[in-house]
Amino acid sequence: MSIILNNIYLKISLFFLSLIFLIISSISLYISEKLPEAQEIREIELQIPLKIFTSDNKLIGEFGEKRRSAVSFEDIPPYFIKAVLAAEDDNFFNHSGVSYSGLLRSLYRILISGEIQGGGSTITMQVAGNYLTGRDVSLFRKIKDIFLAYRLESIYSKEEIFEFYVNRIFLGNRAYGIASASEVYYGSKIKDLNIAQWAMIAGLPKAPSAMNPLVNPRRALIRRNWILSRMYDLDYIYKEQFDLAIKAPVSASYFGLASQVDAPYLSETIRRFMINEYGLDAYKDGLEVYTTLDSKLQNHAVSALKLGLESYDKRHGFRQPLNLISLFPENFFFQDLSLRLSLIESSNELPVGLSEVPEDQPLELIYEYLNDLVTSDNKFPVLVISVVDQLIALSGDRKIYSLDWPSSLGWARPYINEDQRGPKPKKYSDILKEGDLVWLERDKVNSSLSLTQIPEVQGSIVSIDPNNGGVKALVGGYDFFLSKYDRATQSFPLLGSNFKPFLYATALESGFNASTLINDAPIVFEDKALEDKWRPRNSSGRFYGPTRLREALVQSRNLVSIRLLREVGIDKVRNYSKNFGFQPESLPSDLSLALGTASLSPLKNAAAFSVFANGGKLVEPYFISKIVDRSGEIIFERKEIIPKQTVDPRVAFVIKDILQESAYRGTAKKLSELNRTDFAGKTGTTNEAESTWFTGFNDFLVTSVWVGFDQPKSLGNREFGSTAALPIWLDFMKPLIETLPKNTSLPPPGLVSIKVDKKTGRRSEGTSSSSIFEYFLEESQPD
């Protein structure tokens, strides 16, 4: 009987075992058919953002939803590998893709909770999920991950799987992969971190938000210390290393885009171009754009423009700040702040510096308002609380700042208008009151604070290679994050006297020469186009009589230029201007053209002056030299374009020679500070000084500076191209002067040098000081 029962039990057992095997086999076959190919991982392209670089490989900008930089296994620090193993899968290098003990723990949690939860996955299974099966939490996905893990282990090495893992994982704050995480949280390469920092990053995959050191430093610290303990228990680190790392504070901070060069205006222009050419995929395809920008020139351009605009701004006084009292209910915050301040002062907690306001104060509206304001460089907004003895102000980060009156605030005379200021202040209450919104500036050297203001005046600076049009530096305004409007490429201010060289070049092409006399005398025009009487004058208010064209251009004489335009012909000048890149139909058709009522962007103006710098060739400005895909293959490279000869090289040479003279004794004589004789330049000031210019150049670099307001208004009666724009150009050039080559060009054939009398412009045989040598086109020699 027992034998029969045993046979029955055996048959039943075999049946159920066969049934289980059949079920497992069927499930395996079903899942296998549903599984993606493990080999596809190699073909899956990680989303890598668009990156923009200077010509010397410095990062300008990065655009994309995800910040990611791939890293190879060989470049991963050994202690970081150990930190990841301690946190995620300490048996990774020994198992075949699946941890059975981990799966049992996961199954136990499912039975206890009744819910499908995460956990129990090896690094290999996580790679399968991250790359192939998705992020949903389900039993079916977990089973797929198990099957795929075995396949992955049979195809790839452990090192390759680990590399897949660390380059794909999300680690919070848009950081994907360990290379980006180290830059986001520590501003450093992964190889340059320490054990405590490696452990912190290794703890992020479990909960990139909840255990983020920026969002929740307490939980992040607990997670990090648990990983360090695991590393010590697994003999990954020594006791001394553990003791040192466990005591380390949370040192993570948010490091935004680690651009090495401040060029947001240009990077935004290139971003728009890339989206237009390549679509939205440009944000994730890992394209790298290499520009013509020179990092050294760009950095100098940014600092020179900021300094120049701030200098102008301070010359014209301290503008009355916006007062916020009216925006809030009466005594909404000042009574509360006064109470808080009295408590701080009574306990001697408020030294010259700052103290913190507790979170329980009803000031959230003010904090929100201040934090919504865009900071500028090292300047930040504060709300004035008191100006009785000191300036006491509240910032958006809940800090109270107190500043004594410094002698350096003599500039802060109250602004009345562009030509008038009030009396020199002696204390803060002379210029401020409670509720004022003002800006403080932190000194970059000693971190001291001072009252400042954000300039309303704007400007731009563009520097290009005159021989090929490559843009070497471009700044489109005071601060991109305060105003994204790119004045270097998108604005078209009136040129003022910056147009005169183009007029004089037309005259030389039309038979005039540099010694031709034009009378500098008062004149009234009945100009039908202007529909009024027009009484132009020189900026000096004086008249100089018969004047050689060279002298007229050197000194930027308005009346000579107007008469010259009338003699040459307005239509001829308009048509000839296309040789410098102008659109003739866009130019005014009246005599005001002589004084620069033509408009041109600073970028195009630099290109126009390049015609004088390069011997008469018109170049087309460009930014991009090449575009490289994620594999390093060049998908676009700008071919060398030979510029078209649009102006007689002799004419270009003579105009350049005249503008070189202007640089040491004319309106641009401040250029003599450079101690170089090969630079040429021209100032420009429009009517009422609404736009001011300076464009200076030699054979190798052309730089154009514009200063004005976005909504045109006078810069002031004492402001000219020589006071507002030229100092910016000089500050830009001075650091570069030692490395910039000197001119090598010689007078072109067909140009002759003849001695002439300074007053008459005619040939001179004498040796007196009244004679000079002048260049002439051989067909336009004087009598």
Predicted regions and their residues:
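Conserved catalytic neighborhood of penicillin-recognizing serine enzymes
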Residues: I112-V137, K191, A258-D262, N467, ...
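A penicillin-recognizing enzyme superfamily signal
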Residues: T291, S295-A304, S311, I344-S376, ...
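Mid-domain, small-residue-enriched loop/turn segments at the edges of structured enzyme/sensor domains
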Residues: E531-R537, G569-A607, E620-F623
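Short, well-structured active-site flanking segments
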Residues: F93-L103, Y176-A179, Y238-Q241, L508-K528, ...
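Active-site SXXK
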Residues: V84-L85, M231, A301, D389, ...
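Non-catalytic, structured segments within soluble enzyme domains
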Residues: S25, E115-L394, L564, K578-N579, ...
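Short active-site loop at a secondary-structure junction
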Residues: S69-E74, D419-S429, I454-G459, L482-F502, ...
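N-terminal type II signal-anchor transmembrane helix
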Residues: M1-F53, N91, L111, Y312
